[in-house]
């Protein structure tokens, strides 16, 4: 059996260098070769016997060809492994969600127990009482009305606070308000004390120290006269000179102050003291005359004027700030 194979086949001897067909036989008994075939062989060169023996062996083993062949089993295994991995991930996610759901159920049960507790019930009862009260309804109603109104209409122009105007109106009210009437003071008392009124001192008019009788009376303890206003003064002189003035008679009398009386004047200096003592008036003497009056200089910037009446003693002195202080000490009966 003769067969003609192309010379371009790479598995034949000579490879692609043989461009002419040749005939070969597959039987072992004999080979029939034509002249054209032999001429072509001699022209191209004789083939080795080894190459002729190897050519049919190569043709007999086509399974050993190095063509790329896809393995279907390996492809299926790869697809299956990816699906298994995805299934594993879904199972893990499902377990996490189940654990979270169980935790939420537990928290929900705790909240229900707390809502059913007595504390929450008491708070609910108190809230109901507050909501049902009239005061809360009034306040809530006002708040709702304020919310319904626009911002520009919530306050009328008259209700808007104006601080400057309010201050000015307040000052006019204070200036226009009527003062409460105080106790009536006789003019002779103000003139004797050298006062224009209860709040103003008149330095231009001298005080009236005259008297109608010439019977002197003993002067009370000086410490009792200054117990309210002269605390804090020191060094009271031990000998106090008193100048008595009467109707046409003048005299001087010296008295000494006890040691315990000096303790009430710890800061009093040692200036000379001039005391004008007026006799005590009797029942037939008009009360417009003073019983006793004297003045003393406690310091260069502080003078105390003392006036004594049958009702008590009056003390007028200037303080450190330049003002005046008036003190009235009634007599003890």
From Swiss-Prot:
Any single biological process term in GO: single fertilization
Region: Disordered, residue numbers: 145-165
Post-translational modification remark: Highly phosphorylated by CDK2; stimulates initiation of DNA replication.
GO cellular component: extracellular region; nucleus
UniProt signal peptide: none
Main location: nucleus
Keyword Coiled coil: yes
Coiled-coil intervals: 83-118
Compositionally biased intervals (Basic residues): 145-154
Keywords, in A-Z order: Cell cycle, Coiled coil, DNA replication, Nucleus, Phosphoprotein
A GO MF term: chromatin binding
Cellular localization per UniProt: Nucleus
TM stretches of this protein: none
Tree of life domain: Eukaryota
PANTHER family, A to Z: GEMININ (PTHR13372), GEMININ COILED-COIL DOMAIN-CONTAINING PROTEIN 1 (PTHR13372:SF2)
Physiological role: Regulator of DNA replication. Promotes initiation of chromosomal DNA replication by mediating TOPBP1- and CDK2-dependent recruitment of CDC45L onto replication origins.
Family: Belongs to the GEMC1 family.
Protein name: Geminin coiled-coil domain-containing protein 1
Organism: Mus musculus
């Amino acid at each position: 059996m003769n067969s003609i194979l192309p010379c371009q086949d790479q598995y034949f001897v000579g490879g692609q260098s043989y461009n002419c067909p040749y005939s070969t036989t597959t039987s072992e008994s004999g080979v029939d070769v034509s002249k054209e075939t032999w001429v072509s062989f001699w022209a191209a060169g004789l083939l080795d016997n080894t190459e002729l023996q190897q050519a049919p062996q190569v043709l007999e083993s086509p399974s050993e060809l190095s063509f790329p062949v896809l393995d279907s089993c390996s492809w299926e295994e790869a697809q299956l492994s990816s699906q298994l991995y995805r299934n594993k991930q879904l199972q893990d996610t499902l377990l996490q969600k189940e654990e979270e759901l169980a935790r939420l159920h537990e928290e929900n049960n705790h909240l229900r127990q707390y809502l059913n507790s007595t504390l929450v019930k008491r708070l609910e009862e108190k809230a109901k009482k507050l909501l049902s009260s009239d005061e809360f309804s009034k306040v809530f109603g006002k708040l709702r009305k304020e919310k319904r109104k626009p911002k520009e209409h919530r306050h009328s122009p008259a209700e808007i606070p104006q601080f400057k105007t309010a201050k000015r109106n307040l000052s006019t009210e204070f200036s226009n308000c009527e003062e409460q009437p105080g106790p009536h003071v006789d003019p002779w008392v103000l003139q004797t004390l050298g006062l224009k009124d209860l709040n103003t001192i008149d330095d231009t008019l001298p005080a009236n120290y005259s008297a109608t009788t010439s019977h002197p009376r003993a002067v009370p303890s000086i410490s009792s006269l200054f117990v309210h206003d002269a605390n804090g003064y020191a060094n009271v002189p031990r000998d106090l000179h008193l100048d008595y003035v009467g109707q046409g008679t003048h005299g001087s009398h010296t008295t000494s102050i006890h040691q315990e009386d000096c303790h009430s004047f710890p800061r009093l200096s040692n200036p000379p003291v001039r005391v004008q003592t007026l006799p005590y008036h009797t029942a037939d003497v008009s009360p417009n005359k003073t019983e006793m009056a004297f003045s003393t200089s406690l310091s260069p910037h502080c003078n105390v004027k003392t006036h004594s009446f049958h009702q008590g003693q009056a003390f007028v002195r200037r303080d450190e700030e330049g003002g005046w202080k008036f003190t009235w000490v009634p007599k003890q009966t």
